[in-house]
UniProtKB/Swiss-Prot annotation:
Keywords: Cell cycle, Cell division, Chaperone, Cytoplasm, Isomerase, Rotamase
Membership in a protein family: Belongs to the FKBP-type PPIase family. Tig subfamily.
Job description of the protein: Involved in protein export. Acts as a chaperone by maintaining the newly synthesized protein in an open conformation. Functions as a peptidyl-prolyl cis-trans isomerase.
Higher taxonomy: Bacteria, Pseudomonadati, Pseudomonadota, Betaproteobacteria, Neisseriales
Pfam family, one: FKBP_C
UniProt note: domains: Consists of 3 domains; the N-terminus binds the ribosome, the middle domain has PPIase activity, while the C-terminus has intrinsic chaperone activity on its own.
Reaction catalysed by this enzyme: [protein]-peptidylproline (omega=180) = [protein]-peptidylproline (omega=0)
Name of the featured protein: Trigger factor
Domain PPIase FKBP-type residues, every copy: 163-248
Disulfide bonds: none
GO terms for MF: peptidyl-prolyl cis-trans isomerase activity; protein folding chaperone; ribosome binding
PANTHER family: TRIGGER FACTOR CHAPERONE AND PEPTIDYL-PROLYL CIS/TRANS ISOMERASE, TRIGGER FACTOR-LIKE PROTEIN TIG, CHLOROPLASTIC
Top-level taxon: Bacteria
Length: 437
């Protein structure tokens, strides 16, 4: 193979000019045309018997284009291997204006290479390690949430109070005129839950079924409905029904409803503590991991390949559209989401992927089989039949990619925590559970 010069363009972009001998192009084109001749069905000739000259007239140009494309791809691969180029993404090929060599056809390949990743001094980085505990108070709090999730509403003949569910008819007017979305019949909501504007809810409190009254409501300037934002409306409200909230007792029936077959309340609390502890651990680990990843990004000066960032942005856009479809938005598949809104996240992901790959390779942080098994077991623990979930993961090797990635990340986090300046941060239960999962 002739020597090829790799030209450095901007940042990670490189350029090589590939030279394809016309003798090779013509030989490959002739071979392709003969293959076409054997398959061709042309009027006036038996199948495969049309003259090669006619086949060349009909298919010669497209055959030559196919051959050039194949040779370009093959030649670029050979050059990349010979020059030990770590190509990121796919190259683009452009014609070369100066075709000064009549013996060959020249094509320019423009591509990006992976950046050299140099891990900086991790001991200079600060990392926040988050901690939290789950005790009786947190179990009590969770049980109370579970009770509220199973609230029953029973009809009562009294004035409406906060926490009651009410059913109302209402009609609103601004300057004496009805407005879009300002009226409804048999509308149900829970007082004090913040479903309606505070002035509206306050007007309903104290009413009895069958009563009607006018309530003045001032829409905030930042109200989501632009047509009414900042305006004052008068609502005529009729209360149809009042229902009082009743929470279930924490007894055997309640425990059974939560999956404790024998209704043992103590077992139920143990199960709640185990589940909540697992979720708290997951969340604090996520926050610690986020801090570690931020430290790695600070420790490494890195320019992510544009091609990989664009690919990741497109993947994130498709992922969002699929999530919309899964939520019932059938038309979301056709959404034209601008990739720019995903670029920052995509660049972060690509950069971290390159940094982690280097860190894992340099420090032998690949997970053991036992570590991957532990991640899978942790996934399965919250399901009714954990073994069924474990068997599902191991039935198809590709399914182990996610738990393997998590095991790698866990090893990276432990490694960085052992090198960096670690500041422990204890969070309350509410702070942890209020954090984004």
């Amino acid at each position: 193979m002739m020597s090829v010069t790799v030209e450095t363009l901007e940042n990670l972009e490189r350029k090589v000019v590939l030279s394809l001998p016309w003798s090779e192009i013509n030989a490959e084109t002739d071979k392709k045309l003969k293959q076409t001749q054997r398959r061709a069905k042309i009027d006036g000739f038996r199948p495969g018997k049309a003259p090669l000259k006619m086949i060349a007239q009909m298919y010669g140009a497209s055959a030559q284009n196919d051959v050039i494309n194949e040779l370009v791809q093959r030649r670029f691969h050979d050059v990349a291997v010979a020059q030990e180029l770590k190509v990121a993404g796919f190259p683009r090929f452009e014609g070369v204006e100066e075709q000064d060599d009549k013996e060959s056809f020249k094509v320019a390949a423009i591509f990006e290479v992976f950046p050299e990743v140099v891990i900086g001094d991790l001991s200079a980085q600060e990392v926040e390690k988050v901690t939290a505990s789950v005790g009786d108070a947190e179990v009590d709090q969770t049980v109370e949430i579970l009770r509220k999730q199973r609230t029953r509403f029973n009809h009562v003949e009294r004035e409406a109070r906060n926490s009651d569910r009410v059913i109302i008819d209402f009609e609103g007017k601004i300057d004496g005129e009805p407005f879009a979305g300002g009226a409804s019949k048999n509308y149900a909501f829970v007082l004090g839950a913040g479903q309606m504007l505070p002035e509206f809810e306050a007007g309903v409190v104290g009413m009895k079924a069958g009563e009607s009254k006018d309530v003045t409501v001032n829409f905030p300037e930042e109200y989501h409905g632009k047509d009414v934002a900042g305006k004052t409306a008068v609502f005529t409200i009729t209360l149809n029904n009042v229902s009082e909230a009743t929470l279930p007792e924490v007894d055997a029936d309640f425990a059974k409803a939560l999956g404790i077959a024998d209704g043992d309340v103590a077992k139920m609390r143990e199960e709640v503590q185990k589940n909540v502890s697992r979720e708290v651990e997951r969340r604090v680990n996520e926050q610690t991991k986020e801090s570690v990843m931020n430290a790695l990004l600070k420790a490494v000066e890195l320019k992510a390949p544009v091609a990989l960032v664009n690919e990741e942005a497109a993947r994130l856009a498709n992922e969002m559209k699929q999530n919309f479809v899964n939520q019932g938005m059938a038309d979301a598949a056709n959404l034209d989401l601008p990739l720019d809104i995903f670029k920052e996240q995509a660049e972060r992901r690509v950069s971290l992927g390159l940094i982690l790959a280097k860190l894992v390779d340099e420090n032998k942080l690949e997970p053991t089989e036992e570590q991957v098994k532990a991640v899978v077991a942790n996934f399965a623990e919250s399901y009714e039949d954990p073994q069924e979930v474990i068997d599902w993961y191991y039935a198809e090797p590709s399914r182990l990619q996610a738990p393997t990635s998590l095991a790698i990340e866990s090893n990276v986090v432990d490694f960085v925590l052992g090198k960096a300046k670690v500041n422990e941060k204890a969070l309350s239960f509410d702070e942890v559970m209020g954090a984004q999962a």
